[in-house]
């Protein structure tokens, strides 16, 4: 492909391109980028869709300019022409994304609250939901009847779940102590 002073000089020119395998492709140059090594040919419309060929310039053997090319580029937009709004598609995409996020949150909440034990107090589940918003990796340990953060830190109802308290295992490290303090602050907020 010859290098032009300006890549835009070729745009709109009718050409016949012979490829390295001796196949011929005709069309109007839609765009040419010598630095990227790309030539895009416009070949008219099939139905309402444009027919475009993208060719890598290393595979071009020969380019011949055509005098009266029947295929021309579509006309440019007028200065005051307005493109169709993309807002409808954007709204649909946002709605789809929001619906997906909501469905995932509901599934996660259902999984979090799934317990076969009918004796689980409602106040314990309320505390679990409150803490799960901040600490998403916690879970309900139905065998011990506690909310478990890790092996060292749990939340128990003392004496019942209307006043939950954070309990730390003996010999726990500084990280667990720090977590205990943060959880206690979270529980003290209403």
From Swiss-Prot:
Q: Tell me which residues make up the AD domain.
A: 84-190
Its keywords, alphabetically, are:
Translation regulation
Q: Which domain of life is it from?
A: Eukaryota
Enumerate the spans annotated as Sm domain.
2-69
Which molecular-function annotations from GO does this UniProt entry contain?
A: RNA binding
Stored InterPro entries: AD, Lsm12-like, Sm
Family, as annotated: Belongs to the LSM12 family.
Tell me the subunit arrangement.
Answer: Forms a complex composed of at least MKT1, PBP1, XAC1 and LSM12. Forms a complex composed of at least MKT1L, PBP1, XAC1 and LSM12. Within the complex, interacts with PBP1; the interaction is direct.
What name does this protein carry? PBP1-interacting protein LSM12
The record lists the organism as: Trypanosoma brucei brucei (strain 927/4 GUTat10.1)
């Amino acid at each position: 492909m010859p290098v032009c002073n300006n890549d835009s000089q070729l745009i709109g020119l009718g050409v016949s391109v012979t490829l390295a395998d001796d196949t011929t492709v005709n069309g109007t140059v839609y765009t040419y980028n010598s630095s990227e090594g790309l030539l895009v040919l416009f070949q008219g419309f099939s139905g309402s869709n444009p027919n475009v060929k993208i060719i890598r310039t290393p595979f071009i053997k020969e380019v011949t300019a055509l005098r009266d090319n029947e295929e021309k580029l579509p006309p440019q937009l007028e200065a005051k022409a307005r493109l169709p709004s993309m807002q409808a598609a954007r709204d649909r995409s946002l709605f789809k994304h929001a619906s997906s996020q909501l469905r995932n949150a509901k599934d996660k909440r259902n999984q979090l609250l799934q317990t076969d034990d009918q004796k689980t107090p409602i106040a314990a589940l309320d505390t679990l939901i409150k803490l799960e918003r901040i600490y998403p990796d916690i879970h309900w340990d139905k065998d011990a009847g506690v909310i478990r953060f890790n092996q060292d830190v749990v939340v128990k109802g003392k004496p019942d779940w209307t006043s939950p308290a954070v309990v730390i295992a003996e010999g726990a490290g500084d990280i667990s102590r720090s977590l205990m303090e943060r959880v206690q602050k979270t529980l003290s907020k209403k």
